Amino acid sequence: MVTGRLRNTKHFVTDPITFLSDSMAQHGNVFRFQLVNGSMVGVTHAHHIKYILQERMANFTRETQLYDILELFAGRGLATIADHNRWRRNRRLVQPAFHHKKISALSEIMVTEIDSMCDEWAEHARAGRTINIGEQMSHLTLRIVVRALFGLDPHGPEVTGFARAAQSVNAELGKFVRMPLIPLKFPTPSHRRFWRAVGEMDAIVYTVINELRDSDSDGLLSMLMNATEADTNSKLTDRELRDEVITMLFAGHETSSSALTSAMLLLQVHPEARQRLCDDVDDVLSDGRATMTDLPALPYSKQVLEEALRLKPPIWMGQRRADQDDEIGGYHIPAGTPVMFSYYHAHRNPECWDQPDTFDPDRFTPDAVAARDRNVYLPFGAGGHLCIGNTFAMMEMQLALSTIVRRFELTIQNPDLTPTSALTLNTKYPVIATLTERR
């Protein structure tokens, strides 16, 4: 038993995706696995994930080790709050900032920042310089979120500092999430890097909150500061604002940058899809830039992104704990059992998808979507905890991908689709590309 726990733990820590793939192949869609710090149930079917997140949401709580860890840096934002009543109260306060009309009004911010990045890329192309696509997408999506959220200049040192700190948190916390044997309060080199990064993020966010109190900014953060709950006349405290801002900044740029990087990498290794997308954007974008009004005429760019989100979901897994005895797919779940579910494996489950490992954007034509069980695709979660920023993210990504493909031909050096999993799913190796301007 001890040997098995050690073997499982080593495999899980070094490569959790392959570990879960092997477990799924051997045991099916629901299985228990033993690690040195305890046992856990794994779930790899979308219907079972929907059951956990929607049908039995009240029984499967966020009171898990994963959310305890996430709370250390993200606090109690919408993505991490365990108490359901508090989550509902904060969701009501935050929701108006993400109304469709508000998001649509932010499209010009997205277009401006995308154009600015592409102008920088044009200089790189003329000079023959390479770019790191992952880093470029991270900077772009953070700049967009900073302007939309804060209404501030996204090119200042605060943005660079936050991006650096967020990358450090993602890397160091990803290690700890997989195997939290040494408490974070112990000053190992990794833990010191984590706490230093959290301190940097806090300093930046609190400074901006204080500055915005005396400004006339109309960004989302100003809306959150002024949001009042009708029943209690209460507002978000500074700590609650900090937690929501950290959550939005981290989730709002890490996830979108991961998806955009994956989409461009997948297009590189599937030239027929890349050419089809080029043909689409060439027909629609005569001036080389996509705006919100162009998006309905660019369905294939959305299909490419949706398929990238299926194969490479940035938020690739989640955890819950059974408050009372339950049953998932005929498998008994005793009260107190931690459950880990994988969107990555659910999106590649052969019971739900034909040729699940094949990149095929035509899975997301209107006819294909209408013919498919809508419960098998969960790129933004499910149930009441569905990602509040999903409309923002899809608009941002479609604008960016369409404009990039219209303006540039990217040649990625040694494209490798191997994933690596920290808090978010990323490519294992840097995605380095040369640029050629398209006319």
Regions found by a protein language model. Give the residues of each.
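Cytochrome P450 heme-thiolate monooxygenase catalytic core
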Residues: 1, 61-67, 71, 86-87, ...
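Conserved cytochrome P450 K-helix E-x-x-R motif and the immediately C-terminal K′/meander segment
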Residues: 8-28, 203, 207, 288-329
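Conserved cytochrome P450 K-helix/beta-meander segment immediately N-terminal to the heme-binding cysteine loop
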Residues: 341-369
